[in-house]
């Protein structure tokens, strides 16, 4: 069974994770930017993560990627709602903070990039799309843009018509 990956969600999740990993801003545009802003809204609905208990089971560097994926899947518990997705992203933030604050347990950058890409691909799966709640905001923003275009065209047309009438 193959499932599609939403590229806009992938970009937004990857930008969010890279932003937290490097403490720098990563810019995304269009629908990805809307989704990125919605990711921050997910954290108001997170459950509490017993990170200290979870991190005690962290293996050595060679198996840490599989451990992160297994832990993330365990947190999300095959649910596709905003609470599980938000909690999974909160876990990733805690994981990055743990690695930054514990240099003796630090993981090399290539493994971290692999983890970031894997998490972004998992969350960009179509079954998690509703958790990001991007469709309504994107449609509303598109409708507002269209309304603004029509209003500006009407205003320009009215002014142009008035000038032409005055000249003739």
Swiss-Prot record:
UniProt superkingdom: Viruses
Keyword annotations: Early protein
Induction (free text): Expressed in the early phase of the viral replicative cycle.
Matches recorded under InterPro entries: Vaccinia_virus_B6
Any Pfam family: Pox_B6
Family note: Belongs to the orthopoxvirus OPG191 protein family.
Protein known as: Protein OPG191
Organism: Monkeypox virus
